[in-house]
């Protein structure tokens, strides 16, 4: 998935057999921003990529939450969704592309899933709503919200805002 000059690769894989020894759905979503995506190569003592950063773990969770309820009830095959940022322009946020890419990868697969979903970031500057604002626009924005949903409903909302009315918040979800 590419937006501006930011590119994210999303892949999915599922076990052929269900795990009978578990009582939950084993979904693993992993989001990673490789240093090379931003034009950096790890140097010095550490030459390899480190463990996931906090924002990568949080992005994995924000990507997992809207995907999980759309799998069939009782589905127990292990599913892995791997999302890698291949290129980042430093302007467009790759985390919302993770949800779009994961949805597209699941739709292209044979894994049973009741998608697709879309994921967008909503910002607001001077009472004007902006879809997928740039990093610079987010700095000016009094609202930063990530919304995932399909044509029937909103599946997940996560974000923060300065003081605003309930009507303004609901308007930003439309």
Regions picked out by a protein language model, each given a short descriptive name:
Residues 66, 97-109, 172:
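Stable alpha-helical structural segments in soluble proteins, enriched in small hydrophobic residues
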Residues 109-173:
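Mobile "lid/hinge" segments at catalytic clefts and subdomain interfaces of large enzymes
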Residues 44-46, 97, 135-136:
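Short intrinsically disordered coil segments
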Residues 3-81, 85-92, 151, 158:
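Glycine-rich, flexible beta-strand/loop modules in the N-terminal catalytic cores of phosphate-handling
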Residues 19, 98-103, 137-138:
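A glycine- and small-aliphatic-rich helix-loop capping segment at beta-alpha/alpha-beta transitions
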Residues 8, 106, 114:
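Short, electropositive, low-hydrophobicity segments enriched in small/polar residues
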Residues 54, 58-62, 76, 97-100, ...:
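Conserved active-site and cofactor/substrate-binding residues in soluble primary-metabolism enzymes
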Residues 93-99, 116:
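Short glycine/serine/threonine-rich phosphate/pyrophosphate-binding segments
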